[in-house]
């Protein structure tokens, strides 16, 4: 564990802005004694919210005033060129300058992707950054799914690099040296899928850096068959949101059924420890926080509609990645690849 951690938060992003990000920030600094948070956004709004929580004078909550906000309607190019004093841009600049070790935002995904790429730059050798997040499975450990929407279409080399970065993330998070990596496809047979997926499969199969186990279908995501599942951003984003929607549907239907009859209510009371455990297992809030990997800094993207609890989960994810020194670990792997390629030339 590092002695002191500093994380910059985009307080104004997302559907709820400070209404969810400020309670999350207060809870996070209370949970982590070594954590300081720089709250980037409208000082007046932030101060008022902190005061309502009796936390205005908290020594580890530092307000950094920003005069602009990147809205959900803002186009990525406009955000990069014109929103230089936005809460998102200031938070990323703090990571670039070294004043903060990570940035967390629930703002406009496209704008965050382009702005983070522009401000922090790519790690040497990495073609494209990717969004990666944990998804619950039937087994004890989650599966790490990437890309979740940063890149709509990916060529074979990019998918291969995602496999490498996913292996590093899963290896660090799960504490395993050789995480199992799979490509998401429309079938498990070698002949299935388009040409980029087939070529990516060959690259992964031949690589000593990846423990490639073959293709996975959509139904395999939850089985725990793989530790890492790689896909294009369009597919990954649809898959993730479908997973979250199904989880909410099941829990809502289950809750409605229990409340319908007195007998079911009595059963629910007796089974409440099991029900709570199940809900905790599938609740999307605890998995909130997709990491934008491949950059020279740590950026965690929270859901735009994140509750305070969910936004705190994204902060917790950023804390873990700082402690694991994730960008350095990824950079070291790509440096080995570059050194090997140089020797072979």
Swiss-Prot record:
GO MF term list: phosphate:acyl-[acyl carrier protein] acyltransferase activity
Catalytic activity line of the entry: a fatty acyl-[ACP] + phosphate = an acyl phosphate + holo-[ACP]
Location of the protein in the cell: Cytoplasm
Assigned EC number: 2.3.1.274
GO CC entries: cytoplasm
InterPro entries according to UniProt: FA_synthesis, Phospholipid_synth_PlsX-like
Matches recorded under Gene3D superfamilies: Isopropylmalate Dehydrogenase
Pathway entry: Lipid metabolism; phospholipid metabolism
Keywords associated with the record: Cytoplasm, Lipid biosynthesis, Lipid metabolism, Phospholipid biosynthesis, Phospholipid metabolism, Transferase
Primary location class: cytoplasm
Biological process according to GO: fatty acid biosynthetic process; phospholipid biosynthetic process
Record note on quaternary structure: Homodimer. Probably interacts with PlsY.
NCBIfam families linked: plsX
Purpose: Catalyzes the reversible formation of acyl-phosphate (acyl-PO(4)) from acyl-[acyl-carrier-protein] (acyl-ACP). This enzyme utilizes acyl-ACP as fatty acyl donor, but not acyl-CoA.
Family as reported in the entry's similarity comment: Belongs to the PlsX family.
Protein name as catalogued: Phosphate acyltransferase
Organism: Pseudoalteromonas translucida (strain TAC 125)
Gene: plsX
């Amino acid at each position: 564990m590092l002695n002191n951690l500093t994380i910059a938060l985009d307080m104004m992003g997302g559907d709820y802005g400070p209404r969810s990000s400020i309670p999350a920030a207060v809870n996070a600094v209370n949970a982590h004694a070594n954590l300081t948070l720089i709250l980037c956004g409208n000082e007046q709004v932030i101060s008022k919210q902190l005061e309502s929580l009796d936390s205005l004078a908290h020594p580890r909550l530092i307000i950094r005033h920003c005069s602009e906000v990147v809205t959900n309607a803002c186009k990525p190019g406009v955000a990069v060129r014109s929103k230089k004093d936005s809460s998102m841009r200031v938070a990323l600049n703090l990571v670039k300058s070294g004043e903060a070790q990570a940035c967390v935002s629930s703002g406009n995904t496209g704008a965050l992707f382009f702005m983070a790429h522009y401000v922090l730059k790519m790690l040497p050798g990495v073609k494209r950054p990717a969004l990666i997040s944990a998804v619950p499975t039937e087994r004890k450990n989650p599966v790490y799914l990437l890309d979740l929407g940063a890149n709509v279409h990916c060529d074979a080399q990019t998918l291969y690099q995602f496999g490498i970065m996913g292996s590093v993330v899963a290896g660090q998070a799960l504490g395993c040296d050789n995480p199992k990596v799979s490509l998401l496809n429309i079938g498990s047979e070698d002949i299935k899928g388009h040409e980029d997926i087939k070529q990516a499969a060959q690259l992964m199969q031949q690589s000593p850096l990846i423990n490639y186990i073959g293709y996975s279908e959509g139904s395999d995501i939850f089985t725990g068959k793989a530790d890492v599942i790689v896909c294009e951003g369009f597919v990954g984003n649809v898959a993730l949101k479908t997973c979250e929607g199904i989880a909410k549907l099941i829990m809502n239907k289950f809750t409605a059924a229990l409340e319908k009859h007195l007998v079911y209510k009595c059963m629910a009371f007796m089974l409440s420890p099991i029900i709570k455990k199940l809900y905790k297992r599938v609740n999307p809030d605890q998995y909130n926080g997709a990491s934008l990997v491949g950059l020279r800094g740590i950026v965690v993207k929270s859901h735009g509609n994140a509750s305070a609890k969910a936004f705190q989960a994204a902060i917790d994810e950023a804390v873990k990645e700082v402690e694991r020194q994730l960008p350095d670990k990824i950079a070291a792997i790509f440096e080995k690849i570059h050194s090997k390629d140089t020797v072979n030339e």
